[in-house]
Amino acid sequence: MDYKTSGVDIEAGYKSVELMKEYVKETMRAEVLGGLGGFSGAFSLAKIKEMEEPVLLSGTDGCGTKVKLAMVMDKHDTIGIDAVAMCVNDIACAGGEPLFFLDYIACGKNYPEKIAAIVKGVAEGCKQSDAALIGGETAEHPGLMPEEEYDLAGFAVGVCDKKDMITGENLAAGDVLIGMASTGVHSNGFSLVRKVFDITKESLDTYYDDLGTTLGEALLAPTRIYVKALKSIKNADVTVKACSHITGGGFYENIPRMLKEGTHAVVEKDSYPIPPIFAKLAKEGEIEEQMMYNTFNMGLGMVLAVDPADVDKTMDAIREAGDQPYVVGKIEAGEKGVTLC
């Protein structure tokens, strides 16, 4: 008996690494020391000496059950973008610059082409966020997971000067809320999504006029990465007072996380266009409006607060980065929380 007969194919692992090398190479930054295949990823921190008080920021996450759609559709080259986005957006909304990322893929069986496709998406997410992919792990779990299944997670590390951290401590009544458009459902709420829709290849390949695409393409659209938008805002000399990454828990859970005591966020629901996938979800699943806003991003992947005098500069900076901003509300004095009107 050998390792392969027990369900772990070492040769497939080697082939996976060879296939993914070209994608990983495209993410390299000057600070990366060494190459792929070492026992650890190494990243020089020499540049942060320019900061007064450098602070390392970290984020770890996965794609939830969205990976099930990728498996059913047999489309694996975008789900990695989601894994990166979930981590680097958290770092960015704290004021940080992502530095590097590492991924973890657990699978029932290592199919090299599939694993390489997943890493291709991870590398694309890293390129979109200017983070280096400095390592990762692909673990075969025979007997624990079905051969065709996998799960994907990762973590990112970033840095910022302490004085530039976005903390919400200077938030004040009268500040303006600006939302940045999402691509759709992003990476949260898919357990509910999978209860609403019949997740089969046939149903996911069905084209809907109201979506302008197939159901699968609408649901699998990669999570938008907002790193460059926030960097553009900083370069425009705008101080972001507070920022929230709208993920699991939707508006009701995530917007209050950016508020300080004594401040209340008011969001106008008709101030921006809501992607049609949400109306379809609500209708097909008979989901009440409050539950929709308490589960999904409802078209806004990130919400930030700025001084009224900085609104125009902020909107311009976001557009220059390729994202779509909307003025969606304001900050009022009151109990910490959010009101949708």
Residue ranges, per PLM feature:
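N-terminal amphipathic/basic leader segments beginning at the initiator methionine
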Residues: 1-31
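Glycine-/charge-enriched secondary-structure boundary and capping motifs
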Residues: 2-6, 114, 118-129, 145-152, ...
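Residue-level signature of catalytic and energy-coupling elements of molecular machines
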Residues: 9, 61, 174, 245, ...
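Short, acidic Gly/Pro/Ser/Thr-rich loop/turn segments
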Residues: 13, 49-50, 63-66, 161-164, ...
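Buried hydrophobic packing segments
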Residues: 16, 20, 42, 87-88, ...
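Hydrophobic face of alpha-helices
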Residues: 17, 116-119, 190
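Glycine-rich phosphate/pyrophosphate-binding loop regions near the starts of catalytic domains
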Residues: 22, 28-183
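Acidic, glycine-rich loop-and-beta core segments that form the ion-binding/anion-interacting portion
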Residues: 173-217
